[in-house]
């Protein structure tokens, strides 16, 4: 049985209510960017790195150095065709990425998201949290490293669950 069922979480995947590009983050990752790059390559996921334009992935140190020089390196990854994950290097201390809710409709696509979150979380040994676009203090779901599974962190039926009130 899947970690998350579409019928239980589909309200969280409404782009009109929660923004098109929810934020996903792994905190405390100073040494983990290279592990992420190695994961992308070992999984055989398609990717494109947009800062240097070179077909090979740079080292994590090069990506973090570019971010420190007021650039925002962007790594676009397709774990499956038609599902894009966009990693942006803002700082070494966290791995930040976006997914497009329009691409994640239905159980099959939810399972792809859970697979990506689980793959990253297990490889890094850290939890991976997804929040509505622009609401970093309101995690909706994620991979819980201690539970070793994807978990729902809010009541998806409560329409005020993401408000700051």
Where are these regions (language model features)?
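Short, well-structured hydrophobic secondary-structure segments
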Residues: 25-80
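Glycine-rich, often proline-containing surface loops adjacent to acidic residues and nearby aromatics
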Residues: 16-23, 90-101
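Short, flexible, solvent-exposed loop/turn segments with mixed acidic/basic and small polar residues
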Residues: 7-18, 85-91
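Terminal, regulation- and interaction-focused segments at domain boundaries
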Residues: 12-32
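Ordered hydrophobic segments in well-structured contexts
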Residues: 23-25, 48, 74-76, 86, ...
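Sequence termini and other peripheral, non-core segments
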Residues: 1-7
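Acidic, proline/glycine-rich low-complexity IDRs
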Residues: 1, 102-165
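Aromatic/basic-lined ligand-recognition segments
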Residues: 66-91, 146-165
């Amino acid at each position: 049985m899947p970690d998350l069922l579409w019928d239980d979480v589909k309200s969280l995947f409404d782009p009109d209510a929660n923004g098109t590009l929810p934020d996903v983050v792994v905190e405390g990752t100073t040494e983990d960017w290279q592990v992420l790059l190695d994961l992308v390559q070992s999984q055989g996921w398609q990717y494109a790195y947009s800062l240097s334009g070179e077909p090979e992935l740079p080292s994590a140190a090069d990506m973090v150095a570019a971010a420190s020089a007021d650039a925002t390196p962007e790594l676009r990854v397709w774990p499956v065709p038609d599902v894009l994950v966009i990693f942006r290097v803002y700082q070494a201390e966290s791995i930040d990425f976006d997914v497009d809710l329009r691409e994640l409709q239905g159980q099959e696509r939810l399972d792809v998201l859970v697979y990506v979150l689980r793959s990253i979380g297990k490889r890094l040994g850290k939890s991976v949290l997804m929040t509505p676009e622009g609401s970093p203090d309101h995690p909706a779901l994620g991979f819980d490293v201690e539970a070793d599974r994807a978990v729902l962190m809010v009541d998806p039926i409560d329409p005020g669950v993401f408000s700051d009130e």
